[in-house]
Amino acid sequence: MNRQGVRLLPDRGGSLAAFGVGLAVVIILLGMGRPPICPCGVVRLWHGVVESAENSQQVSDWYSFSHLIHGFLFYGAAHIVWRRFGFAELSPRWALALAVLIEGSWEILENSPIIIDRYRSVTISWGYSGDSVLNSAADIGFMAAGFLFAARAPVLVTVVLGIGFELFTLWAIRDNLALNILMLVWPVEAVRVWQGGG
């Protein structure tokens, strides 16, 4: 099959592999002692208060938009790898499973003491204690949804939507994927003060 004919959507095997990887991540997170659900004992589909004990504990929150963007970006990377460079060693049906592996690896790292402490020390997430397993699983699901959306939507639509999500969350909570990465890797005190309402 030529590069233009490569399909990046998973077949049944690819979908099962993606699900299996996600399930393995859930098992690892439980083994790490992460709480299965919010310690408050309540499960909500949405929690919109960033500075609260339930942030990153429920099914979705403001940072779910970032995970959708992860999916957009992972699909873009897969497109480059398979369509532009003809990555023949691995069938494109595994692209989603590979994206889930990357996202799941981040969820595991994000819930490790080193990253939790980093978030607490350099970002506005002063009380951050990691995600519930429910939230991590949902984050992986949002990434997969973003990946599958990008696989079907025109590139321009995906790009505009991603920028829209970034601007919307920047307006709503003074945070987004770009600022999250910036503050985690190279903290800027002025940004932290602004995010804190200063």
Swiss-Prot record:
InterPro entries: DUF2585 (IPR019691). The keyword Membrane applies. It comes from the Bacteria. Pfam families: DUF2585. Coiled coil: none annotated. It is a multi-pass membrane protein. Keywords: Cell membrane, Membrane, Transmembrane, Transmembrane helix. Its main location: membrane. The chain crosses the membrane at residues 13-33, 62-82, 96-116, 153-173, 177-197. GO terms for cellular component: plasma membrane. It is found in: Cell membrane. NCBIfam families: PRK00944.1. Belongs to the UPF0314 family. HAMAP family: UPF0314. This is UPF0314 protein Saro_1818. It comes from Novosphingobium aromaticivorans (strain ATCC 700278 / DSM 12444 / CCUG 56034 / CIP 105152 / NBRC 16084 / F199).
